[in-house]
A protein has these predicted regions:
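Short, glycine-/small-residue-rich phosphate/pyrophosphate-handling segment
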Residues: 71-117
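Short, well-structured alpha-helical segments in soluble
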Residues: 21-31
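Short coil/turn connectors at secondary-structure junctions
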Residues: 30-34, 57-61, 98-102, 108, ...
Length: 172
């Protein structure tokens, strides 16, 4: 387990944290079967998307998750989100290969492609959506995988791009 310090204070620091996170995964890639990242919800989609472009050639899962309610609150969504994110990251096919081989966001029973996810609500448990790409999986009693939607890289090995620019404007 690695912790990246306190909450981000500014957009300038976010780029550095993305670099740190990408570097930690890159340096530990061969030691683990997958990665689950607990993240605040306000910037989770941005971080997950950035990592999906910074780390190319993934053959292992990187699953982002978090919660709308703090983990200590009895009705928190965080426990289910964390447990299912771990289950998704550990899931393998009949050949023992990870089912998920990309960066994704898991939230409230839904698995989204990271660079197609967006936070859509600060007040509902269904806080994320993917208006431009369908779900990768849906969790219920079983996890229902939509295999035809899962990304498979053609790159032979993991490649990392650690440089990011802070000169980007987010316009809504």
């Amino acid at each position: 387990m690695a912790k990246l310090g306190k909450a981000w204070q500014s957009l300038a620091k976010i780029g550095k944290d993305w670099q740190s996170l990408a570097y930690i995964i890159y340096e530990n890639y061969d030691q683990y079967d997958g990665f689950v990242i607990l993240h605040g919800t306000d910037t989770m989609a941005y971080t997950a998307s950035a990592l999906s472009f910074m780390l190319q050639g993934l053959k292992k899962p990187i699953v982002f998750t978090g919660s709308q309610l703090p983990i200590g609150i009895i009705r928190t969504d965080g426990k289910e989100n964390l447990i299912t994110a771990i289950e998704i990251a550990a899931a393998t096919d009949a050949q023992g290969e990870p089912i998920l081989q990309e960066v994704a966001v898991y939230f409230e029973y839904a698995l989204f492609r990271a660079n197609r996810s967006s936070k859509v609500s600060a007040h509902q448990f269904e806080a994320f959506a993917s208006p431009n790409y369908p779900l990768l999986a849906k969790a219920g009693v079983q996890i229902e995988w939509f295999q035809e939607r899962l990304f498979r890289t053609q790159l032979p090995t993991l490649q990392a791009q650690f440089e990011v620019s802070n000169e980007v404007l987010i316009w809504r």
